[in-house]
């Protein structure tokens, strides 16, 4: 997200402005940086993998399996970086089918190889890791091959594989917002799990795992809608087609809001149906259903949060998108997880309540800022275009 989404958003705006050479420079810089980051991740995480695994919940019983998996998986870091990071440059040009194919191809390869390596060759966890990095390598080859081909306007060119601070600085600044949204998820999980372990024990932690898994599935759908609209917004903003920017955002906003309201209603009315997809133990299902009623209560506002924040990214609004990325999880959610149990007698209820409170406050703030700033952003762009030399 840091390199791919920031670079893809910047590149599509430059394409809209008719500056294809600059867009290709962005792609070249991002490609090389993704390769460097992939190699660096392999080295760094190999050096500190054991304490890192314990930090994220590994125990004496599971550390051996975790180490076996990570020892192999880390060697595929460069493939992950290229497959995921460069995919943004494909979808930002409108090749959504190609972008989707890169994900599906990797998934199919992984599904086919898993039983062969895990059971057929009796490799166990190591086989699962090998299947995963093989699938990621296939996806990476697919993505790179497409971006070197003739169908795409943005092409990977050897002469442009260089690092230029002037090109990368705005890319990284813009990509920081989605990067923080994804990376802070680990901090949120640590805060939730440690608090629930203290106040409710293992059953509460298990219920939280189910609730967060359900929420993650729906969040991916919100992200898909937002990321599908991003290249359209960015290209037309760069091209000066400001009415199209407004129309695209309106469609994104109302479709996201309708979907989030429908998802919230479904989870509140049929929580048992969704919980049973993840676990069938009666004791855990009972507490998870109770928890999901609380946890999903603010979900109806997520459509506002995602559509407004991702549109800020598409418009190149670095500072405000960074603030909004920090707002929901770092500024609101984590402090609420730690503070609410101090003020409510039912402390487990208080921990789960932190999620809807943060969702509603963050979405309300995001929406207010967006609808106040959008007319000013578009008016500034209109004036820039009027005074631009012909």
Model features per residue range: what roles?
Residues 61-65, 125-126, 167-174, 195-216, ...:
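Interfacial/gating helices of multi-pass transporter permease domains
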Residues 73-91, 99-107, 128-141, 223-226, ...:
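Short runs within selected transmembrane alpha-helices of multi-pass transporters and secretion channels
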Residues 132, 141-185, 376-390:
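Interhelical loop/hinge segments that connect adjacent transmembrane helices in multipass membrane
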